[in-house]
Each structure stands twice: as structure tokens, then as C-alpha cells.
């Protein structure tokens, strides 16, 4: 994948995360605060815990830091998959957000 392809796919992912935060706030009482700064999105939950998603352009990876740990994702041609086998990005984000929010939350691309 070229740098341009990575940035195109990665920007789409960050936009989808932002849009999911807006949708979740419109349809639940989760009260997520999603803040975008350059190539990073920080999601802050009501309990002040955070999930941070950021681009690692030199590695063509997206990193996610949650209370449960750190995750690295690479695009496999179809989806962003965890480099250590923990699954697809939006499934991992939904799982970690659910744990940190204390209620079921679904992030989608």
C-alpha cells in the first residue's frame, strides 16, 4: 500500500469513528466526547476514561489505546485487522467502548 492509499483509508476510518460518536450520542445516553486533532481521535467517556486512536503513517498502521491495552491495526485489503489476531478494528473499538462506557455501544464503518 502506498502512503497515499494508507492516508485515504485511514482518513475514512477516523471519519467513521467521529460519525459513530455522533450517532451514539444521538441514540443513547452514553455522552461520548469525540475530539479530532490531526491524525488522532480521542474518545472520552462519562467516567473520564479514554480511548485514543491515532495514525502511524510510517508503519501504515492505526493504533488504539484503551483501558484494556494497546492495539495495532493494518489494512488487509478489505478491513483494518489487529496485527496480533485480536480481530477487526470496529469490533475491537465497540468491545472496548462498551467496557469503558458500561453500556453496549456499536461503532461502524
From Swiss-Prot:
Biological role: Involved in iron-sulfur (Fe-S) cluster assembly. May act as a regulator of Fe-S biogenesis.
Domain of life per record: Bacteria
Bilayer-spanning residue ranges: none
Gene label: cyaY
Any one GO cellular component localisation term in the record: cytoplasm
Listed Pfam families: Frataxin_Cyay
InterPro entries for this protein: CyaY, Frataxin/CyaY, Frataxin/CyaY_sf, Frataxin_CS
BP GO annotations: iron-sulfur cluster assembly
Record keyword Ion transport present: no
Any one GO molecular function term: ferric iron binding
Higher taxonomy: Bacteria, Pseudomonadati, Pseudomonadota, Betaproteobacteria, Burkholderiales
Name the record gives this protein: Iron-sulfur cluster assembly protein CyaY
Organism the protein comes from: Acidovorax sp. (strain JS42)
